[in-house]
Amino acid sequence: MSSKTVARSGTRTSRSKATSRGASRSARSAVPRKRSRPVKGVGRPSRRHHRSLLVSTGLACGRAMRAVWMMAAKGTGGAARSIGRARDIEPGHRRDGIALVLLGLAVVVAASSWFDAARPLGAWVDALLRTFIGSAVVMLPLVAAAVAVVLMRTSPNPDSRPRLILGASLIGLSFLGLCHLWAGSPEAPESRLRAAGFIGFAIGGPLSDGLTAWIAAPLLFIGALFGLLLLAGITIREVPDAMRAMFGTRLLPREYADDFEDFADFDGDDADTVEVARQDFSDGYYDEVPLCSDDGPPAWPSAEVPQDDTATIPEASAGRGSGRRGRRKDTQVLDRIVEGPYTLPSLDLLISGDPPKKRSAANTHMAGAIGEVLTQFKVDAAVTGCTRGPTVTRYEVELGPGVKVEKITALQRNIAYAVATESVRMLAPIPGKSAVGIEVPNTDREMVRLADVLTARETRRDHHPLVIGLGKDIEGDFISANLAKMPHLLVAGSTGSGKSSFVNSMLVSLLTRATPEEVRMILIDPKMVELTPYEGIPHLITPIITQPKKAAAALAWLVDEMEQRYQDMQASRVRHIDDFNDKVRSGAITAPLGSQREYRPYPYVVAIVDELADLMMTAPRDVEDAIVRITQKARAAGIHLVLATQRPSVDVVTGLIKTNVPSRLAFATSSLTDSRVILDQAGAEKLIGMGDGLFLPMGASKPLRLQGAYVSDEEIHAVVTACKEQAEPEYTEGVTTAKPTAERTDVDPDIGDDMDVFLQAVELVVSSQFGSTSMLQRKLRVGFAKAGRLMDLMETRGIVGPSEGSKAREVLVKPDELAGTLAAIRGDGGE
């Protein structure tokens, strides 16, 4: 303890000594500061003040020079970064800039070499160029101007760029070598200036020295010829055909044979009619049509929509000459002709769309971003091409040897992050290609007009009245479909996805292609406002139905119509309604003797339900049973259903409905579950809305992505007005009338010992006009189960409507009909 105390005291002593020494130093240092305080009138402080002023001035100048230097450095760096970002300029602007630079150089070179007018800089440029290419400098302005014009008048084609550069280089080098040989192969520098310069000497000199000029000249000529073939993009074997096509010497029958390859037995001279290939739904009535004269005006507007509207990185493979031949065939496509006084509305009433957009700098940036993601995750794959569609661009990724497809699909979220979008959809693989497709939305979407779809070549070639325009796919092809081949369609999509626009496009397509004698419609619109513009069109069987109960009755009437058609086809021994109509027109079949009926061709019937969910909530059993019966066997009878819904849940789109409706069209859905309900697979939840959809026709394994066609309210009004001006609707009686109650027994009608209680319940409900189970419990003093059974018995006899959840049931019997209803019930009970 004593040692510790001594150590502590020693430590305190040393600290105190150090403190005293520090204090003495501070005291000594404080004394001189007091002595060095400046005194007025003494010269020594003034010299120090003069030196401090010089130092301050120097420091200020240094700071100013540093600021100027930093500003210059920042300006230079900003300019360099701006120049580096020049690659983000649109390809068209970049090509125009290069072309204008070439024109400027052509002017300078022409002034210096032709007129000796651009001194002193022009003399230096002329001397430099003559050193390299000699007297060929006089042709350089013409070549530069020609290249500039080509750049300004053509679109970029990255695939052909190496071929063009190599071809131009071969032509230029061979020409300089020939010029050197023509000038006598001079070796002196002064003589080379008047020949082909240093380049001509380097090309032609070794050839002439080693092989003589007589052999060198043909070799150089062959090199120039090969360069010319590269520029033209043809081979030697194709030269004769190219010359014939250039000078118009191709034989006309061969050209027409190419143009009319889809028609049968056409000789190009004296054919007045052509017969379109019979489809499986055709009855021969729409097959034979007169051939339009070549001199006559086209039936549709002459505005052509380019077919080749895709751009790729590099461009996706396409048939050569497809655009030229496609345009030539469009002029020969025959339009549909109908019989009778009714005239189809002209497609001039519809608005044509803008030309398709080409590849932009954004597509190049997206391809680079996808490639960087693959590189960062060390996946042996590369972006080999892209195809731009109206809504999305599909980038094709080819995998290296031994790379699993799952490595690409697992990077979906990383690729979405790289391209700064959520709606990235992968297609592994692309149908018909050994590549994985990555679909990325375009920042500049294009609108697909219904007029362009209906005037497309493939749509006009199909003369069936049930052909509807769908839209345009990623490849840039217009997509149409035949309802007779579907034969029923299920459409689903959330709010704003484009479902209502599709229904409008489908109806306008039918109105512009079919007469009321060919197609009749039943429009069911529980939302009351979607199909209002079509009220009064002559194609309607009954006025537009807005009440769910009447809709269920209309579907039941459609079942009866289907059964009647099958009975007629059975009696006529035909299997399809088209065959029946064909025989009726030809007089091959007539009504049986003694019958009051008269056989007439049956029109196609298209029933469109705009919101299936409302019907399924009101009368699920009746609606589902009718839909299932129609979809199971109505195809041969010419009856087709189009079911649309915003809520594709399992209680709306039931298993029986899905099984019997093979064709599906899904727009953007709110969840993966909805996508699987409508398509039986994922994908619809990745769509971006506004007409972006997936079409899964009957028999297809993978859906086709397309942009739905758009038709405006003004176009709808114009087409509907044109239809109303020609005919009035002829409504059929009894379509929305419900069947007698005796036929609508879904619950066991045996009342048993509860007759008195049941009569009291009926009297109570009818007199109060309030169908509530809880009211029966209170008034009759029965349990919930018995009150519910009484309500079900009243529903089977048509006294109350179906259950609507927690709401009271609708009472269908009026108080003044109570006596007759009670008498009918007593009669039932007595049986």
UniProtKB/Swiss-Prot annotation:
A GO cellular component annotation here is:
cytosol
| Listed InterPro entries | FtsK/SpoIIIE/SftA (IPR050206), FtsK_4TM (IPR025199), FtsK_alpha (IPR041027), FtsK_dom (IPR002543), Ftsk_gamma (IPR018541), P-loop_NTPase (IPR027417), WH-like_DNA-bd_sf (IPR036388), WH_DNA-bd_sf (IPR036390)
List residues binding ATP.
Answer: 496-501
Residue ranges that the UniProt entry lists as topological domain Cytoplasmic: 235-831
Q: What else is known?
A: Was identified as a high-confidence drug target.
| Purpose of the protein | Essential cell division protein that coordinates cell division and chromosome segregation. The N-terminus is involved in assembly of the cell-division machinery. The C-terminus functions as a DNA motor that moves dsDNA in an ATP-dependent manner towards the dif recombination site, which is located within the replication terminus region. Required for activation of the Xer recombinase, allowing activation of chromosome unlinking by recombination.
Q: What is this protein called?
A: DNA translocase FtsK
